[in-house]
């Protein structure tokens, strides 16, 4: 059970970091970078949904 919790915690941190980078990329008009990050964003979001994490407050981008 502890391993599952560690994986979820890591995924949450990754999700937050990815969103920060996406926001920065969008501000800098780095759309190619934004699209690559968006792929990671979608994958991590799907993983967190499967893990049952409520993303309503964590998801800033909401795409």
Task: Give residue spans per PLM region.
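Short, charge-rich amphipathic interface segments used for partner binding and complex assembly
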Residues: 7-10, 17-63
């Amino acid at each position: 059970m502890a391993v599952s919790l560690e994986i979820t915690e890591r995924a949450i941190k990754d999700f937050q970091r990815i969103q920060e980078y996406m926001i920065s990329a969008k501000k800098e008009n780095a759309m190619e970078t934004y699209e690559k990050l968006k792929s990671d964003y979608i994958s991590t979001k799907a993983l967190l949904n499967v893990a049952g994490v409520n993303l309503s407050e964590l998801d800033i981008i909401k795409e």
